[in-house]
Amino acid sequence: MAFRLKSDVRLAGSWLCLRGARALGTRAVTASKASVLPFEVIPQHQGNKRQRVLQFWKEQNHDDLHLEMHQTFQELGPIFRCDVGSTRIVAVMLPEDCARLHQAESPYPHRMHLEPWMAYREHRRQNLGVFLLNGPEWLSNRRWLNPNVLSPKAVQNLLPMVDTVARDFSEALKQKVLQSAQGSLTMDMQPDIHKYTVEVSNFALFGERLGLFGCNPSSQSLKFIHALEAVFKTTTQLMFLPRSLSRWMRSQAWKEHFEAWDYISEYAENRIQKKYEELARGCSQYNSIVANLMLQGNLPLRAMKANIMDLVAGSVDTTALPLMMTLFELARNPTVQQALRQESMATEPNIYENPQRLRMELPLLWAAIKETLRMYPVGLFLERFLTSPLVLQNYHIPAGTLVHLNLYSMGRNPEVFLSPEHYNPQRWLENKETYKHLAFGFGVRQCIGRRLAEVEMLLFLHHVLKSFCVETAFQEDVKFAYRFVMMPTSAPLLTFRPVS
């Protein structure tokens, strides 16, 4: 195997493919470009809208939604329509359709409200943050937040903090391995990775460490993690039904949902108040996103709390899943893993001296993360309400339609990705086409925490792979369920051995 450093990393030799996987294709629609076809002739998902609402009502979960949508694309082609209640939806899955959506985007890209989260904020008379807002108020909040969360300067400030947490995690894992009599450690990594993402999020937002890597994390820290888990679990149970139905059908889920948000709300308020008191005592240096927002003084306190709650909820599972699945894929693709380890070891001195060069120094590792997100997207789809008519796949889509861009089906489409069943990071070094890496969205409404998430994942994998060989006896594909975000139904055990 040949290996070159920097941006022209090259791998020669065979790539190990996913065991048991099969190629998944989508029948293409070949419509004449001479005339645009009316909305009514778009292939339609079977079943009327009342039946679909009753189905959501009857079922306790929607675990296979990604598989159902994928099968529908295979049967009907790259575009289809359906109604859920009173909402008219068009589903697409090709990069060209994302490009058209982006080109037609208004200054205020409009997304569907997440009903359970909206219900909590309204009932508690709290402000909405950027995740839930639409229109000019969304843009105003976003402009206040972007310089402190998304900008290159913001990431430059946050990167040393994330690096500290990633190094501490690797060191804590090393201590666990050394304490093992076998000289290696086999474990379910989900809980530990979850602790890592919560630790990073809390440190970046509030400038405080939670101490989650120790033997006895505080009960307050564990309660915070449980509250985050409860929000996501109950969101899935409630999001598909109108409040008028779910209030009496799923009253226990509403109770758990509100209790979890109450804890997160109180947690955020206490941390914001503590930071305010620190700044009042003259601690004016940069040490967190909240501190910087306060020093600038542009964001009203109620709006700050609302946005911090959004950032807290959105910053954990979005990185935990890709980290776990990257470790799993590297465990069953040892040739790829070794190439990444060589890259990390060769570039460690440069990264240590200048952490800002992280992405430039680790192109293959970044490609591996993109490949993981292609195969295992955290979000099932991106969505936009059309503010003006648009043509997609030669069909007229009227204004007011909700368009779903399905990431799972795009990533599994052989017309978009050659041999999509193969875990092949190299494809991202060779292919520079846009609108294929969409895990963090697109346009002005892309994920506000994407750059923080990117360095969080890069630094975690960089430090872990330098220190450990990762193995697994589990060679089957991991099954996933849709639970507001994509989640594995069970986690494969991973074995960590110190690098000799």
Curated annotation (Swiss-Prot):
Q: Where does heme bind?
A: 447
Q: Where is this protein chiefly located?
A: mitochondrion
Query: Would you say which domain of life the source belongs to?
Result: Eukaryota
Could you give a single Gene Ontology term from the biological process aspect? cortisol metabolic process
Family of this protein: Belongs to the cytochrome P450 family.
- Please give the function described in this protein's UniProt entry: A cytochrome P450 monooxygenase involved in the biosynthesis of adrenal corticoids. Catalyzes a variety of reactions that are essential for many species, including detoxification, defense, and the formation of endogenous chemicals like steroid hormones. Steroid 11beta, 18- and 19-hydroxylase with preferred regioselectivity at 11beta, then 18, and lastly 19. Catalyzes the hydroxylation of 11-deoxycortisol and 11-deoxycorticosterone (21-hydroxyprogesterone) at 11beta position, yielding cortisol or corticosterone, respectively, but cannot produce aldosterone.
The name under which this protein is listed is: Cytochrome P450 11B1, mitochondrial
